[in-house]
Amino acid sequence: AIRRARRKGRRVVVPTPVVAQVHRGGWDRASMDRTLKAVDTFLETSLDTAMHAGVLLGRTDLTHAVDAIVVAEASNSLTTILTSDPDDIGRLVEADGAGRGVYVEAV
């Protein structure tokens, strides 16, 4: 999915908590390194973004803070979120205000 986005000329941006979520061991290190090298920008999570994510979790009764951080980071731009959990991400996007230019794509 990241390679496809790159071929389409899209920037690949990843909030740093996502790396913690996927970096749990038991994975192919070379594959992880290739994936991380394909990322254009890693976003540090600000206090405002973390608080926005908390509000989204409260609105949805979901518990995955990393998902909420991804949506909070995306909320101010025309963005496609690539995710293996489109249901929860979709709920968070809706809670943030439908039609704001954030799209969810399952991978």
Residue ranges and their predicted role:
Residues 22, 64-80, 88:
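Acidic, metal-associated active-site segment
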Residues 75-107:
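Acidic, PIN/NYN-like endoribonuclease modules and their adjacent C-terminal/linker elements
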Residues 26, 57, 93:
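Short, flexible helix/strand-to-coil boundary loops that buttress conserved ligand/catalytic motifs
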Residues 1-14, 23-40, 97-100, 106-107:
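Short, well-structured N-terminal submotif of metal-dependent ribonuclease cores
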Residues 39-60, 86:
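Acidic catalytic patch
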Residues 14, 44, 65, 83-84:
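Short beta-strand scaffold positions
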Residues 16, 26, 47, 86-87:
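Alpha-helix N-cap/helix-start capping motif
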